[in-house]
From Swiss-Prot:
The keyword Cytoplasm applies. It catalyses: 5,6-dihydrouridine(20) in tRNA + NADP(+) = uridine(20) in tRNA + NADPH + H(+); 5,6-dihydrouridine(20) in tRNA + NAD(+) = uridine(20) in tRNA + NADH + H(+); a 5,6-dihydrouridine in mRNA + NAD(+) = a uridine in mRNA + NADH + H(+); a 5,6-dihydrouridine in mRNA + NADP(+) = a uridine in mRNA + NADPH + H(+). Pfam families: Dus. Its main location: cytoplasm. One of its GO terms (biological process) is mRNA processing. Present with 2650 molecules/cell in log phase SD medium. It comes from the Eukaryota. Gene3D superfamilies: Aldolase class I. Signal peptide: none annotated. This is tRNA-dihydrouridine(20) synthase [NAD(P)+]. Its cofactor is FMN. PANTHER family: TRNA-DIHYDROURIDINE(20) SYNTHASE [NAD(P)+]-LIKE. InterPro entries: Aldolase_TIM, DUS-like_FMN-bd, DUS_fam, tRNA-DUS-like, tRNA_hU_synthase_CS.
Amino acid sequence: MVTYAGKLVLAPMVRAGELPTRLMALAHGADLVWSPEIIDKKLIQCVRKENTALQTVDYVVPSKVQTRPETLVFRTYPKLESSKLIFQIGSASPALATQAALKVINDVSGIDINAGCPKHFSIHSGMGSALLRTPDTLCLILKELVKNVGNPHSKPISVKIRLLDTKQDTLQLVKRLCATGITNLTVHCRKTEMRNREQPITDYIAEIYEICQANNVSLIVNGAIRDRSHFHDLQANHWKNTNIGGMIAECAERDPTVFDHTSKPSEDGPSWVVACREFIQWATKFDNHIGNTKYMLSRIVPGKSVFFQYFARCKSPEEVSFVLKQLNDDGSAQTDPSEYLENCRAQEKALKNANAIAKQKRKQTDHIGSDTKKQKVVPLPTDI
């Protein structure tokens, strides 16, 4: 069974936590990686498929329209993730959480419940940080997962929360959660209304850890951890405990190499150039959706760089690859790819117009054929 104590891990992040980011983080020393939050009902709809071309396991929602492709919900690469992937589920129902977890349990290393996300898409159905206001439901979800999923499959169940309004309320909740049978507790050291630009509250991490330790539950702390060097400094000088783990979110989104055990300056240019090139390699290898690739590049590439706009104008992996070839080691542009991108848009427009004309012609042909069928043949008189 996977262990969490003292580990430095990649946070669950919607959009940013897809396969290329997770694999890049693992390649640079992340001990564990979390999947993005997947809602229970969405996962239950999925069909599991083994992608032999990519050697991945894909969870897809079949299309209701035969001409439309299926929707990829989650993709994992067992060769590198099999023992290091924690799957996060968004749920407000013990039954649905259990059903969803059973669907994916054989392809992941553990199940985590999201009880900390304050975004509307999580809380509107009682999920995410809304569960902090319904602790009875949260505890029941965890107990059911431990009983019906974790124990039978020898896989850990964990939960990620935020701080409550008071220290006393937080510690009381931690006691209840640790009594459910979970293996790990992740605490985002900010209250629900706090934003990431605000400094995390770390005054009573030691007391949270004591409760966890008494229940044989490991503790991971999330909030403003920059990289592995910073994590080790927190363990040694602030938390004074090497058994407390750390979770990196925003800094890993901007640069998934922050898990490296060494922080030596790269000889290949600015860190964002190195990260950009490597991320595109991972994205290309695993057929990442162009929208997600562009999102991650918008996080990795500085806004002041001309390449921020160049990548934003791309609409295909081929265009991303072309733009990347123009990127010098120092972050400057070898040539301006604008003309190439404009030609791509012109070709796209021409193809769209050609398809529209062809569609219109088909409609006219179908209309003529329909009118012909409607015409009645008048028989000639028989007495001529």
